[in-house]
Design a protein with these regions (language model features):
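Flexible, glycine/small-residue-enriched loop-and-beta-strand segment within the central core
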Residues: 1-67, 94-95, 101-103
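Short-chain dehydrogenase/reductase
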Residues: 55, 73, 90-92
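Conserved catalytic segment of ABC-fold P-loop ATPases
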Residues: 69-72, 86-87
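Tight coil/turn sites that cap or link beta-strands
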Residues: 77, 87-88
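A short acidic/histidine/glycine-rich donor-binding loop in glycosyltransferase catalytic cores
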Residues: 89, 96-97
């Protein structure tokens, strides 16, 4: 099972040759609008960019306004909440952080 939750006005960009394990969630939104006292929406969708050849581990969650460079690995159960534009990273944890650099992976 994989979930791509994209809102009106949002965008999820998934590069070529990515590999997603089961129960991966990628969201460009918060599921529900949050409004201020004037009734204006304060939590607009923000795009998610995932580069080419990215391996996303089981039960990883990638949230709005996140970016992952090419040739990266996202560890199982990780929660990505920010931008990691550099290539060849191993990213893991909650919240996700860089745990190794200069890596790559093969199927």
């Amino acid at each position: 099972n994989k979930a791509f939750l994209c809102s009106k006005g949002g965008k999820i960009i998934l590069g070529k040759d990515c590999m997603l394990a089961s129960d991966v969630t990628i969201r460009d939104n918060d599921a529900h609008d949050i409004i201020n006292k004037s009734g204006e929406i304060t939590n607009h969708p923000q795009q998610v960019i995932i580069g080419d050849h990215v391996w996303i581990g089981m039960r990883a969650i990638i949230l709005k306004n996140s970016e992952i460079g090419s040739d990266c690995i996202i560890g199982a159960g990780s929660v990505v909440v920010k931008k990691f534009p550099e290539n060849n990273l191993m990213i893991a944890g909650n919240p996700a952080k860089v745990v190794k650099k200069d890596i790559n992976w093969i199927r």
